[in-house]
Amino acid sequence: MATKKIFISAGETSGDIHGSNLIREIHKKNPSIKIYGLGRNRMVDAGLNCIHDMSSRSVMWMHTLEKIPGLWNVFKDCTRFFDEEKPALVILIDYVGFNLYLAKAAKRRNIPVMYYISPQLWAHGPWRVKKIRKLVDRMVVIYPFEEAFYASEGVSVKYVGHPLFDELNTRNIDEILVKKMRGGEGKTIVSLLPGSRKQEISRLLP
């Protein structure tokens, strides 16, 4: 029996973190599955056979794929992989501008597409839902309201919870530091999480 291959695409730091955890869980279920795709160091450490390192390719999407330096070649290498290796499944993690191109390429080749961690279409770009419905076989979402949002649009969807909580469960919480930050009155701590792109951090943080 041929070894099953899965292709995963994650273009950003956050996607690399969640993608690495996903790869580990897949290998817990079936260590023989070979995983290829696009990612960064964490996914490689988890077992990704990396076609392209995406460390320097996180961009704000304002152009077509052909006009973004380097990404067109990345896309062509991915489609070549689809043709030659015929993966059993393509898993896309956020990074909507690029990943929808991959979804379309996979769909043309009759390769099932799963989208893990939805792009925030409910906040911006709701017109992309039509593309999702056409190109993606299964949305796997991390917020409860996203499940209702996609279901109302006729998209096959499953809510699985936020992977950040799984990540936190692997960390030791410094209770002394938490108590110090809250102060004597036990104040609530609020975290500012502007995103993983340098552009987002520079634009959104004070």
Regions of interest found by a model, annotated:
Residues 4-182, 190-201, 205:
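Active-site and donor-binding regions of nucleotide-sugar-utilizing enzymes
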